[in-house]
C-alpha cells in the first residue's frame, strides 16, 4: 500500500468513528430530553411509601419514607408527632417486676471509654426511654477519675443516653451543667433541671428542648437540691420538688409547677416535723405522688401527694416494713416518722395501690447492699409488718445504692394504664472499695401482671482497675 492509500484509509476510518460518535451523542441528547419531559410532567407529585421497619443496635424505629419524583431525593425520618401526656391513668395492676435494662457501665469501662457517673435515673417520653446521669467530667480508668467521691463540683453535668447502654462520649447527649438534677417529657419536649454553683448560692437552670427558659435561685443558701429522678407530667404541666436547708434537720421544701420550661406556680410545704429530700415522683389518675428520703429522723419514707393546683396531702408510709437505710428490723410502723435509726438515709421509692404499697429497699438494714421489692397489701395505712410478696433483684452480698421510680405512659406502651417501673443504682469504688474513684452502673425493672423471677443482677465489675494499682 503506497503512502496515498494509507492516508485515504486512515481518513476513512476516522470519519466513520466520528459519524458513530455523533450519532451516539444525538441519541444521548434525545434520551435526556425525553427523561426531562417525563419528570417535568410529574414535577409536583410526591408519593408516600409504606412504613418501613429498620432494626439497628437493638432499637426498632418506625419510619415514614417520602420520595420526591422530581429529583429522586429520598428522605426518611422517625415519626415524632407530639402528644400531650395526659397522666390521667391509674397504675397498671401488677404481680411482680420484670427486668427492663442493665447497662454494665463499670464492667465495660475497665477497657472502654465510659463516663464516671453517679445518680443515674430513667425517664420516658411517648417515643423512647433514656437514662439520665450526673457525670464527673471524667472517664473510668483515667487519672481524672481520682477524687470523684465528691458530690458537688464544677465538672459535673447532666447527660443522657439510650436506656440500657453504657454512658460514653459516643452515645451520650449533654443536657445541663449540674450536680443535682431532674428531667421529664410532657409529650412535646424534654424539661431538664440542673442545679450547679456554690453551696450557699446554687442556681437551678431550667431548659425546655435544650433552651434555657427559667432559673431558680437558692432561697435558703444551704445546698439547693432536687430529685435525682424524673419529674412528673400531667396534661402538659410538669411538677418537681426542691429542698433547701439542712440535711440533718428542718429544711424548706417547695413544689414547682412548670409549663414549657416556665414556672407557673410554686408553694412551700408546711412540714415542720418532716424531712423531704430526693423525692421519687409519678403521676397517678391526674395527681402526683412523691415518696422521699427523710435524712433527719425517719427510717420510714415520707410522702406528699398533690393535684395540679398544688393542693397537697402529706404523711409517712405507715408500714412496719421500713423502706430507708439505715433502718431497724421490721416491726411496729408509724404513720409519722419512725425515729429508731432514723438519721441519714438513701434515695428510694414506693408505689401506692389503695391501702397497699410496693416498697423498694436495700436488703441490708445498715449498708447500701442488695435490693428487694415487697408488697404489703395494707402498708400504706396500717402499721404491722406483714407482707405478701417479696422479690429479690440484687443479692445482699452485692452493692446497690440509690433507687427511684419512673413510669411508662399509655402513649408509649399502648396500654390503658400507667406502667410502674424503677431503677437501682449499683455504686462501685470509694468509699467502700479500694479505688481512687466512685462510679456506678444501673438496672431497671417494670411492673407486669405475669410471671417474674427472683435473682441477682449485680454490677459485676472486678476491682481494682489498672489506674488504682
Swiss-Prot record:
Which family is this sequence assigned to?
Answer: Belongs to the glycosyl hydrolase 34 family.
- Domain of life, per UniProt, equals Viruses
- Active-site residue numbers: 151 (proton donor/acceptor), 402 (nucleophile)
Report a single Gene Ontology molecular function.
metal ion binding
Name of the molecule in the record:
Neuraminidase
Q: Tell me, which GO biological process terms does this entry list? A: carbohydrate metabolic process; viral budding from plasma membrane
An example Gene Ontology CC term for this record: host cell plasma membrane
Protein topology in the membrane: Single-pass type II membrane protein
Segments in the Intravirion topological domain = 1-6
> By its UniProt entry, which InterPro entries does this protein fall under?
Glyco_hydro_34, Sialidase_Influenza_A/B, Sialidase_sf
Q: Which Pfam family, an example, fits this chain?
A: Neur
> Which region ranges are annotated with the description Hypervariable stalk region?
36-90
Where are the stretches annotated Involved in apical transport and lipid raft association?
A: 11-33
Virion surface face residues? 28-469
Which organism is this protein's natural source? Influenza A virus (strain A/USA:Iowa/1943 H1N1)
| Name of the gene this protein is made from | NA
